[in-house]
Every structure is written in C-alpha cells, then in structure tokens.
Amino acid sequence: MFACSKFVSTPSLVKSTSQLLSRPLSAVVLKRPEILTDESLSSLAVSCPLTSLVSSRSFQTSAISRDIDTAAKFIGAGAATVGVAGSGAGIGTVFGSLIIGYARNPSLKQQLFSYAILGFALSEAMGLFCLMVAFLILFAM
C-alpha cells in the first residue's frame, strides 16, 4: 500500500497541486486582460497548464487573512497586557519586603524606604512599558 502511494503521489505532483489549489482560479482568469470565451478557455487549458498560471498570480489579501491579522493583534496585545499584572505583583513584593525589613531592623528605615521607592519605580516603569507595547500593537500596526 505504501509503495503504491509512493508512485501515485510524487513530490512534484504534490507541490504543483498544492500551489494550484492555494488560490482560486478566478483570480488568475480575471487577471488576464483579454475577454475569455469557451474557445479561449479551452485553448488556455491546452496552451498553458494551470501550474504555469500559479506563478503569475500577484499578492492578494482576503477577508480571512485580515481576520487572522486582527486576531493576531488581539492575542499579541493581550500577551503584552500580562506584563501589567506582573508589575502589580512586583509592587506588592517590593512593599511586602519593605514591611518585613522594617520589622526586622527599624534602624534602617530610611535606606529601606529609598530602596522600596526605587523598586516601585522600576516595577511601575515595566508595567507602563508593557501597556505602551499593547497599545502600539493594537493601534499602530
């Protein structure tokens, strides 16, 4: 069975068939400037095979590809927004560590507070950066 399928589907046949079926034939036929009749369609089929028409197709976008692009935008923006939640967790960790450090050694209050403010600023900056990237993905692309 495997040997039979190996003879029936050669790599070149699979490649040409998949290229042929990837775009509708109407896009190729409409690209030609001459008016097509039944005789010209039959001469078109005889003179140049469909595999040669595949190479003459230009880039086109469809509604499906635009929907896929929109979905990819939303997925990317959602993934970038996850960083904002990480920023909130980082801020909570910074101030939790401040409270624990102050409870262990109250004499270092000023130094601990300055480090906590620095940690808060860095966490908040990363959160704002993630939010900015999410908005760039949504509205600038």
From Swiss-Prot:
Trimethylated by ATPSCKMT at Lys-109. Methylation is required for proper incorporation of the C subunit into the ATP synthase complex and mitochondrial respiration. It is found in: Mitochondrion membrane. One of its GO terms (biological process) is proton motive force-driven ATP synthesis. GO terms for cellular component: mitochondrial inner membrane; mitochondrion; proton-transporting ATP synthase complex; proton-transporting two-sector ATPase complex, proton-transporting domain. It is a multi-pass membrane protein. Pfam families: ATP-synt_C. GO terms for molecular function: lipid binding; proton transmembrane transporter activity. It comes from the Eukaryota. There are three genes which encode the mitochondrial ATP synthase proteolipid and they specify precursors with different import sequences but identical mature proteins. Is the major protein stored in the storage bodies of animals or humans affected with ceroid lipofuscinosis (Batten disease). Belongs to the ATPase C chain family. F-type ATPases have 2 components, CF(1) - the catalytic core - and CF(0) - the membrane proton channel. CF(1) has five subunits: alpha(3), beta(3), gamma(1), delta(1), epsilon(1). CF(0) has three main subunits: a, b and c. Interacts with DNAJC30; interaction is direct. This is ATP synthase F(0) complex subunit C2, mitochondrial. It comes from Homo sapiens (Human). The gene is ATP5MC2.
